[in-house]
Amino acid sequence: FSNSLLQKKHLSDTKCNALCALFAENKGVQNGIIIHSDLLLEYLQENYPELYFVSSTTKVLTDFEQFVSEVKRDDFRYVVPDFRFNKQFDKLQTLSKSEKDKVEFLCNECCSFACKDRKRCYEAVSRKNLGESGCGHRCTANDLEEGYRFSKAMKNPGFIGVTDIQEKYLPMGFTNFKIEGRGLGSALILEFLLYYLTKPEYQLHVREELYLDNMLDLF
């Protein structure tokens, strides 16, 4: 749904419409969809008004005023800023309470903070997901072969840790945070959940309940 290259012909996709219909049927907690394309936004608003919508970080809005304009849009319940805005506290503090309530920070981005090809990277992923070839983009990161590493993400200038949330963001009035990595392996996702959602003194207990036992032999 956050594909940046959608065309009108893609709006009739059977699987995506079935998924939206399923989300819309839920009478309990309201479901939402992360969106890049305004074309898709208009289609979903018309056909699935039960859903709420989130402005995707794949828009790569690197101008703060542009980001603020996105936050002010009534179309979105939440807006995920480019992770390079995460620590620009002087600018973030200028937002009103209602605007702060709409900001959803991406906490654990691993991409280079200085990357200038982020938008092209997302477009390449969009082309691949549409089955197109020859995207013309190749990541030039020095540590590309390592893949995603949480330890590396923690060193990123835009990283938001638990202490940051508790001691900086919450006092400023920000309460929405998201974790990257749904497409990564379950072991990494477990580490995210342990770090962000489990008190340190209970993390080992959770690991033991899930997979650690005296028969596990890794080496």
Protein language model annotation of sequence segments:
Residues 1-66, 70, 76-219:
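Active-site pocket-lining/capping segments in soluble small-molecule metabolic enzymes
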